[in-house]
Amino acid sequence: MYDIAIIGCGVIGAAAAYALSRYDNRVVILEAENDVADCTTKANSAILHAGYDPAPGTRMARLNVRGVALAKEICAKLDVSYKQCGSLVLALDEKELPHLQHLFENGTANGVPGMKILSREETLAMEPSLSEKVCGALWAPSAAIVNPWEYALAMTEVAVRNGVELRRSCKVTDAEAIEGGYRLTVPGGTVETRCVINAAGIWADKVHSMVEPANFRIIPTRGEYYLLDKSEGTRVSHVIFQCPNALGKGVLVAPTVHGNLLVGPNAEPVEGNDTSCTSSGLEFVKTTAQRSVPSINF
């Protein structure tokens, strides 16, 4: 029997394996895909958020701020591509300025270091390509960009070298509680373990409902991006956000660690693992991003 089975080897499963590999445990990772970091971890905004957005006092607030600091340490230790470029949340009209103050107060309560509310002039001095409609911005210097696929892979490699077993193409199709732990059904047999870490991403609710009542549901959200040529990579030097809304942090414009420019995403609820791109979605991303940085050459 294993001590711990980790279901899923995206960035969360990889980080769990990396941390647990320091201890004398028998750990196995069960990854449904044929490689690690093959789902959400390989296709996202690649940003380590500063932590001003979560509500103060929540677990998310505490872990966000602690996590961005830990990620910096891990990337340095494992030689993972990382750049602490900081982020700017823009107010594109006077009505959005109070929201910057709200985020600043959130971040202060959460312990986000070095934040500052910038004037219009200070904002444009930092990013001359921004829209002339900018009224101010929230500056968060601890935000960073990373290669998330490389990050997850590096942590997994260390975990495996330290004795963690990695099983790829090993989808968990059922689970049951047994005396002293759980029995997981996988291709070709079963795995017995004392503990389970559910890091199954958008399928985590289905894994949960194998052994517990289905008391929550994950609704996957598809995001569409433009990844632009390196000729656009210096268009901005920081992660550029608009004021967040109910669907999330909105369409961003950001450099990548490889020198490209990343623009997006939108947020469309979908069924299952729908990763298609649509002309309407990309047009929305383009139009929305140009509110922040009108000169982007799409």
Locations of regions flagged by a protein language model:
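N-terminal Rossmann-like FAD-binding beta1-loop-alpha1 element of flavoenzymes
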Residues: 2-29
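Dinucleotide-binding Rossmann-like beta1-alpha1 core, especially the glycine-rich loop
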Residues: 46-126, 135, 250-251
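Short beta-strand to alpha-helix junction loop
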Residues: 55, 62-65, 90-99, 138-157, ...
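Helical element adjacent to the flavin cofactor pocket in flavoenzyme catalytic cores
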Residues: 138-195
